[in-house]
Amino acid sequence: MPIWCALSTDKPQSIEEPFVNELSLSIDPTARIGDKVKLGNNVVISANVIIEGEVSIGDDCVIEPFVVIRGPTVIGKRNHIYQFCSIGEACQDLKYAGEPTTLTIGDDNVIREHCTMHRGTVQGRGTTTVGSHNLFMVNTHVAHDCLIGDHCIFSNNATLAGHVTIDDHVVFGGLAAIHQYGRVGCHAMVGGMAALNMDVPPYVMAAGHYAKPFGINKVGLQRRGFSKEAISAIFKAYVILYKHHLTIEEAIEQIEPIAAEFPEVEPLVKFLKESGRGIIR
């Protein structure tokens, strides 16, 4: 059972990086580790884990029993992957024909039981990307070509279809789902059992089937240190966008002066200009 060892770095280790340091590893004898797998320092591999293909796992990761990880996959440092997860498996896209697409996971993520994260497609980004400091609760599904930022929370049974983008500090409620190519902006909050068929702008709370806007995520912004003035400016922009019965172009024109004074509003303006599916209304 060959084990390769990787040099510790501050970023998720590249599959191509050579392993040159001497490491402290804890690997259960029932685990199956392929000869292309690269493990960092202090990695814990529990019973009946299967790791195959070009997989790189950074320092201080814990892989609980019965996890399956397939490559090409790069996993950063201090990630904790709980039992029965499937990480880096081939995507559920009928166009996929076995191309060597990838999954990249950052640092300090908690991935709870039965989560699934699939590699990308050549028709999409070619990779599925997960940032750092995220919590994926039980049964969360991250489909091919998704792009997930940092500091997000996905509650039980959250479902992301292919090509979805989730920006930083998003909270996703239990059983919520988002349509392929959808996007959720930074600091947004998606209610439990919500069905998203359109994009959710930054700071907005969304709920329902299909999801509608229900104000801004004021409590979340307060917890993250936004000033009262910035929160008021964000709410003013929200009112312009949703209460004045304007087109998106007209709303942007009225919100841009607010963003010039309060940079916290700029992500909303940028999001509105970039939205591909249109926003929830």
Language-model segments: which ranges?
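Terminal amphipathic alpha-helical/low-complexity segments used for targeting or macromolecular assembly
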Residues: 1-30, 35-36, 41-42, 78, ...
